[in-house]
Amino acid sequence: MVRHMGFDTEPTGYEKTILSDLQGAWQCLRREIAENPGFDGWERALLHTDEAMSWESVRNLRQMQRTLLLVRNILQRADVPQGVAECLEEVSALMDETLAALASGEID
């Protein structure tokens, strides 16, 4: 008996775009935190941002959402530079959009 191995299908264009945008927003946030050290909690925020960008989180968006909540809580308690706050808002908006697309079946 010959068994054929199944292959996963390639993500749709929308899925690639929204996930790429989300990854880019996390990279922006990480860069802003790293370039503006010194505010209260910056090292913890950087650590958890790296965690959110890990393969485990990318493959489990609910885990990424939990990590975003943690990062947001750390940053909102501190007097962060404007660039950090703007990148945090972008990550939050794209996370919401990505989770909505996941819930509606637009991405898996």
Residue positions per predicted region:
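Amphipathic alpha-helical binding modules
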Residues: 75-108
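Charged, low-complexity interaction regions
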Residues: 31-42, 57-65, 79-85, 107
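Low-complexity, intrinsically disordered regions enriched in charged/polar residues
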Residues: 12, 16-19, 23, 58, ...
